[in-house]
Amino acid sequence: MERELWPPLYHTLLEVAKDFQQRYVSYQPWVLAAVFLWAALHDRPVSWACQRRHWSTTKLRPARLPHRTTVGRRIDGLAVGAFLREVERRLRDRRQVSLLALLDGKPLLVSGVSKDRDAKRGRAAGGMGKGYKLHTLWANRALPESWEVTPLNEAETTVARRLLPQAPGAGYVLADGNYDASPVFDAAAASGRQLVTPMPEPNAGKGHHYQSPHRKRCIDLLRGDFGRSLYERRRQIERLYGNAVSFGGGLSAPPPWVRGLERVRTWVWAKLLINAVRILRKQGLTS
């Protein structure tokens, strides 16, 4: 996938770099981002990408490559983060936001005997695991409207309340039953969207504790054909995550050289950007 994905990604880095300069540094943020993305695209450590011989398959590369310690020291910092955020925004804005958003989480597991202090034990597909989780809110664009990486044990409802206010527009948010909590319904409504999750039957909404009016609205929706057909579209989430891991350089469990919350977050960021270029290229929107 290198020949297809690297040129549009590299040109986007250069485009953003025209408006983004950091003073008093030997290597601009775009150079560090390029090295990290090249490593992520090939599922290699940064030390590999800092060696010029490993760029022999492309002419699209920085004139000078930094030492691996320079990348390691700065890649998780504010300057590179601000640069990547602008790259993310420009790629995302090549498509219009949808009225239908999809909220979910993807476990990013590490070895059960890993000494990574930030990796925590929590629920994963098929049982318990150790690692992190990527929480996303997608609205039919190449990148999530908002996303966050947390230790695996952090509650999805807690993270959802942080993600929802960051999503522009109005419409519906589809999610699984893990998000069935009144505070999440209220957070979605405050951002202009109606959350739709499956409901326990037959007494949903009849408890004596606080019931969000937006949760009751969800119950009413799911009793009708429109609500049921609307929720069926949640299957798009599985396709989003499935496609994100189905190509070389795609999103998968963090490799052994990626440990610690900050580094895992930056690694996921790189994978999301790579996947975004893949999506846009498929849709003819990479120019």
Regions found by a protein language model. Give the residues of each.
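A short glycine/serine-rich beta->alpha loop
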Residues: 19-25, 59-60, 258-259
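Alpha-helical architecture
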Residues: 65, 102, 174, 236-237
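Helix-centered, glycine/charged polyanion-binding patches within enzymatic domains
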Residues: 178, 182-249
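Major-groove recognition helix of helix-turn-helix-like DNA-binding domains
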Residues: 60-78
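Polybasic low-complexity intrinsically disordered regions
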Residues: 20-34, 38-41, 51, 73-76, ...
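Basic, amphipathic alpha-helical segments enriched in Lys/Arg and hydrophobic/aromatic residues
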Residues: 227-287
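Basic, low-complexity segments
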Residues: 1-22
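DNA-recognition alpha helix
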Residues: 46-61
